[in-house]
Structures are given as C-alpha cells and as structure tokens.
Amino acid sequence: MRPLTEEETRVMFEKIAKYIGENLQLLVDRPDGTYCFRLHNDRVYYVSEMMLKLAANISGDKLVSLGTCFGKFTKTHKFRLHVTALDYLAPYAKYKVWVKPGAEQSFLYGNHVLKSGLGRITENTSQYQGVVVYSMADIPLGFGVAAKSTQDCRKVDPMAIVVFHQADIGEYVRHEETLT
C-alpha cells in the first residue's frame, strides 16, 4: 500500500470532481479526522490516518482491503469509480437525477436511464456532466453521466437516453465476488 503519485492523484481528483465539484475539499478535510487515499493492487482506498497506522503491521501481500475502495486504475491509467464510493460522494453531489419507481429496477440491472424514467434533474446540468442517481425517496442508487443537458431533457423523445449508466448498488449482488 503506497501513496498515490502526482499523476494518479490528478487523474483521480479530476474524475471525482466531475461528480462533487469543489466539494472535493470536504472529502479530504473532514472534522472527524484526517483521511487519505492509498493505492493497493491498482485500487484506490479512502482510509483514515488512524487505521493506516494500525495496518502498517500487516505485510502488503497479505493485505486484501483497507478502508473504502473508491475505484481502480485501468491498464490505460484511467480511473474508474466503484459503487463503494457512492456513500461518500452522494452527500456532496452537485448534480443529481431522480428516477421514477418503475425505472429504478432497470437502472439497478445496469441499464441507462431513459427520459420516460426520469423523475427530476438538477437545474443547469450540462451534457456529459457526472451525476448521482437517486430514487424518488432520495436513496442514492448509483452514478452516471448526463447524456443530455437539463434543457435538452425537456424536449427529447421519451425513449431517449438521458443518463449513461456507470455504477449502481445492484453491483453488490452482480459482482460480489470481485468487489473489495
């Protein structure tokens, strides 16, 4: 387990900033302690300094996971967020999409959000902006990328895609053997 390099930190923070913007500072400087990001087996973990000190006694090859997995770096050095980061990103999300109850199940099975399933969308959401997807009961379901801006969503065909699927809480069941 090692700290992220400058390049890895930049790539990861750019990806997270697509979803929470300048609220990224609130993620790092928390009132309940100091938190940091660490890399282990191409996966980035969000861990408290206190837990990091306790884990120093465990050898790297025996360590499976530590803290919360925020995502992983692909072989092409791009950062991909995991659904396990949802609990930390959802409270700080700038752009949100609420899906109707009938479209929740479709999204949780890994499908995109269609206009017919769109309940609400945050004003001034631009195209290709990172959004957090919520149920109408304000339960975070996952994240995606806005396929259309807020203005375009109003006048688009009901079967058009408005949010591209990225990750959802259904992955806990679908990929339980690979999530760490």
Curated annotation (Swiss-Prot):
Transmembrane parts of this sequence: none
Region (N-terminal domain): 1-92
Entry protein name: 60S ribosome subunit biogenesis protein NIP7 homolog
Single GO MF annotation: RNA binding
Originating organism: Mus musculus
Domain of life: Eukaryota
The protein's assembly and partners: Monomer. Interacts with pre-ribosome complex. May bind to RNA. Interacts with NOL8. Interacts with FTSJ3. Interacts with DDX24.
Region listing for C-terminal domain, in residue ranges: 93-180
